[in-house]
Amino acid sequence: MFMNGSSLNSSALDPSEQALQRPPWVTTTLGCFLIFTIVVDILGNLLVIFSVYRNKKLQNAGNIFVVSLAVADLVVAIYPYPLVLTSIFHRGWNLGYMHCQISGFLMGVSVIGSIFNITGIAINCYCYICHSLKYDKLYSDKNSVCYVLLIWALTVLAIVPNLFVGSLQYDPRVYSCTFEQSASSAYTIAVVFFHFILPIMIVTYCYLRIWVLVIQVRRRVKNDNRPKITPHDVRNFVTMFVVFVLFAVCWAPLNFIGLAVAISPERVVPLIPEWLFVASYFMAYFNSCLNAIVYGVLNQNFRREYKRIVVSVCTARIFFGESSNEAQERLKSKPSPLMTNNNQVKVDSV
C-alpha cells in the first residue's frame, strides 16, 4: 500500500546524499504535523484500549476488533513515525540499514492490519444486524479472539515477503523507509488490489446491506413481533462507518497514485507533482490518530470513559476500584456484542 522509493542499503546511508533541497518551513511544517499525529495517536489509542479494559459495557465481541485496530494504529506511532521525524529534522536517514528495514516492516504491518481490522469490524456489524440469530454462535469470545489472531497472521504473511525481496527502501521525498514497488508493476497492482480495493469492496457491501435493513426496519408501519433496531445500534454503526470512510479517504490518494504509476510509469510519473506525492503520504499517516477521536465524538460510552480515565490519571486513581455508583450502573446493563449496544437485535437476513 506504499509507493515507490529510492534505493537504500547498508552501504548507502549518507544523509547528505539523501537530503532534498527544501525550504526550512516545509520540513518544519511536516515535522510539526507528524509530532501532532504521534501525540494524538498514542494518547487516543491508549484511551481506547483502557476504556474497553475498564468499562464492562465495552467488553464485547465487536470491541475486540476495535482494540485490535487501536493496536495497529499504535504500532506506527511508537517506532516508525519517530524515526521519520528524526529523518525530517536531519534531512536524511542516518539510523542505519536495520532500522530502515524494521521501520518499513512495521509501517506495512500497521496499515494492512488496520484495513484488515476495519474489514473484520464491518463483517461483525453485518452479522450482528443481518444475521443476528446466528451472531452469538459466530462471535463467541473464543471465536472472536481466533478471528483477530487470523487477521494478524494474514497481516504478517502479507508483509514478510518484502524482507526477502529487498523492497523496503528509503524514500527521501517522504523521509520514510517504505515499499519500493516501481520495479514490478504486477506486484504493485496486486498489493493495491488485495490490500486496499478488495477490502474496501467487502466493507462497502457489508455497510450497504446494513443500511438497507435499517431503512426497511424504520419504515415498518404495523407492529410485529420482530425487535426493532434501536437508535443506539444505528449510532454505533454510524461510528464504525465513519472510521471506514476516513480510512478510505486518507489512503485512497496514495493507493491510486501507486496504481496509476504501476499501469503506466513512463506517462504517469512525470505528471505527479512532488507536493501531491508527499501530501498523500502524510495524509495517510494522519489517519492513525483519527479513530480514537471518532469514538469520543460519536460514542457516548467511550466519551464518558475517556473522561473517567483522564480524571483518574489526574487524581492518580486509574488502577483503583471504581465508585459504588459506577459499579451499580454497570451491573444494570448487559454488554451487547457490538460497541455499546444494550439491546440485542434479532432480525434475520433480508
From Swiss-Prot:
Principal subcellular localization: membrane
MF terms in GO: G protein-coupled receptor activity; melatonin receptor activity
Subcellular localization, as worded in the UniProt entry: Cell membrane
Keywords: Biological rhythms, Cell membrane, Disulfide bond, G-protein coupled receptor, Glycoprotein, Membrane, Receptor, Transducer, Transmembrane, Transmembrane helix
Keyword RNA-binding recorded: no
Topology Extracellular: residue spans: 1-29, 85-101, 166-187, 262-267
Spans through the membrane: 30-50, 64-84, 102-122, 145-165, 188-208, 241-261, 268-288
Coiled-coil region list: none
Pfam families hit by this protein: 7tm_1
Induction summary: By cocaine, which increases the levels of day-time expression.
InterPro entries membership: GPCR_Rhodpsn, GPCR_Rhodpsn_7TM, Mel_1A/1B_rcpt, Melatonin_rcpt
Carbohydrate attachment residues: 4, 9
GO CC list: plasma membrane
Gene3D superfamilies: Rhodopsin 7-helix transmembrane proteins
Stretches assigned to the Cytoplasmic side: 51-63, 123-144, 209-240, 289-350
CDD domains: 7tmA_Mel1A
An example Gene Ontology biological process: G protein-coupled receptor signaling pathway
PROSITE patterns reported for this sequence: G_PROTEIN_RECEP_F1_2 (PS50262)
Described purpose of this protein according to its UniProt entry: High affinity receptor for melatonin. The activity of this receptor is mediated by pertussis toxin sensitive G proteins that inhibits adenylate cyclase activity.
Family the UniProt entry places it in: Belongs to the G-protein coupled receptor 1 family.
Protein name: Melatonin receptor type 1A-A
Gene name of the record: mtnr1aa
